[in-house]
Regions:
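A polyanion-binding, active-site-adjacent surface
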Residues: 3-269
Length: 269
């Protein structure tokens, strides 16, 4: 059954096939599909950021993740029953020549997996984009869906795992397979990057790992994650920030000022 997109009104099935008019869908009907880790290694080997995004959004290399993301897209949360679900891997998004990279964990099952854009359509994203707007890095404080007019200024967001995982916990094998997309995307934008904000310990580990694999020297002993933690890797400053999950924001472990402070430091790096 096809349902109307909340912004454009165009109707889509769930999951959304590529090249059918979803806002900002980078893939075409001819975009090659990865069915294995070896395929990911081969298809991530491109010098085009747009093509990398396209290829990553049709990836089917991890059977458990494919099954889960599509199961959620078909079943839908009751509050979103009238909307189509993207139900595919979620690409990096934002400025193509970013000053700041924001690295998270994975799309939320009913957030990015529904909207097709990282940190969009869930409480974590509400918190994150409000902060980016307050410090002058986003043109609006809200993110509801792809095509909603949101723009980032000098910022790009990437999830180390591009599919929504069951219980928000990817396996080591899934993480390692998806790291090939991550590594290439970081390589393609690294020349302009001066700060990386890692949202949570998983993101901190992923950030240090991909920067190291892209030629930057990771300090020894390896820097530990903490809110406000800072590590210098060549021309890049890595900053730690608690993940803006409800577990952290509802309890006061992460406040608006704490979040804003990290993004101000990243902005000024």
């Amino acid at each position: 059954m096809s349902l109307p997109h909340p912004v454009t009104g165009a109707k889509f099935p769930s999951p959304v096939p590529p090249h059918t008019g979803w806002p900002d869908d980078p893939a075409t009907s001819d975009t090659p599909v990865a069915h294995s880790r070896d395929d990911v290694v081969r298809l991530a080997d491109t010098e085009s950021l747009a093509e990398l995004s396209a290829r990553s959004t049709v990836c089917r290399a991890c059977p458990r993740l494919v099954e889960w993301r599509e199961q959620v897209a078909v079943g839908k949360r009751a509050s979103f029953a009238g909307q189509p679900y993207w139900g595919r891997p979620v690409p990096g998004w934002g400025d193509d020549r970013p000053h700041i990279l924001i690295i998270g964990l994975a799309p939320a099952a009913n957030g990015g997996n529904r909207t097709g854009r990282i940190f969009t359509g869930d409480r974590s994203g509400d918190w994150l984009f409000a902060s980016l707007h307050r410090v002058g890095l986003a043109n609006q404080p809200t993110a509801t869906h792809a095509g909603d007019g949101l723009r980032l200024d000098g910022v790009r967001m990437i999830a180390p795992v591009r599919c929504a995982p069951p219980e928000n916990k990817p396996t080591p094998e899934e993480r390692d397979t998806c790291s090939k997309w991550l590594d290439r995307e970081v390589r393609l934008v690294l020349g302009s990057v001066r700060a990386v904000v890692a949202l949570g310990s998983f993101a901190w580990t992923a950030a240090l790992g991909t920067l190291g694999r892209n030629g930057l020297v990771v300090p020894r002993p390896r820097p530990k994650f903490g809110h406000g933690a800072e590590a210098e890797l060549g021309h890049v400053t890595v900053l730690g920030c608690y993940h803006p999950s409800q577990q952290n924001t509802f309890t006061g472990k992460l406040t608006e000022e704490m979040t804003d402070d990290v993004f101000r430091r990243a902005r000024d790096a």
